Amino acid sequence: MDTLCSTLLLLTIPSWVLSQITLKESGPTLVKPTQTLTLTCTFSGFSLSTSGVGVGWIRQPPGKALEWLALIYWDDDKRYSPSLKSRLTITKDTSKNQVVLTMTNMDPVDTATYYCAHR
């Protein structure tokens, strides 16, 4: 009976729940001080044209907590970390399913692993 119930429940899950969302970051692994970092997030499994959807960037310096950087919404509304706002630009290209983050005037304190995320 348990197997039958599990099977029936699985069959009633909407198809959108089963779709797979993927995001992949790309860009240079090393940037010299004062240079500009440009990172690209290429995604699939959702549309950045859909109301309520956003893609953001976060980073994690070695041995430290995650830090939120920027977020862009379907309607092109953009939000930035107040402490980094003057150095960040976030843009989207819905035709390519990409979001690009640019960070100017890089410094050794910006050493981190950078991630993009779906909202």
Curated annotation (Swiss-Prot):
Disulfide bonds join C41-C116. Pfam families: V-set. Residues 79-116 are annotated as: Framework-3. Residues 45-54 are annotated as: Complementarity-determining-1. Residues 1-19 form the signal peptide. GO terms for cellular component: extracellular region; immunoglobulin complex; plasma membrane. Keywords: Adaptive immunity, Cell membrane, Disulfide bond, Immunity, Immunoglobulin, Immunoglobulin domain, Membrane, Pyrrolidone carboxylic acid, Secreted, Signal. It is found in: Secreted; Cell membrane. Residues 55-71 are annotated as: Framework-2. Residues 20-44 are annotated as: Framework-1. Residues 117-119 are annotated as: Complementarity-determining-3. GO terms for biological process: immune response; immunoglobulin mediated immune response. Residues 20-119 form the Ig-like domain. One of its GO terms (molecular function) is antigen binding. The modification Pyrrolidone carboxylic acid is found at Q20. Residues 72-78 are annotated as: Complementarity-determining-2. V region of the variable domain of immunoglobulin heavy chains that participates in the antigen recognition. Immunoglobulins, also known as antibodies, are membrane-bound or secreted glycoproteins produced by B lymphocytes. In the recognition phase of humoral immunity, the membrane-bound immunoglobulins serve as receptors which, upon binding of a specific antigen, trigger the clonal expansion and differentiation of B lymphocytes into immunoglobulins-secreting plasma cells. Immunoglobulins are composed of two identical heavy chains and two identical light chains; disulfide-linked. This is Immunoglobulin heavy variable 2-5. It comes from Homo sapiens (Human).
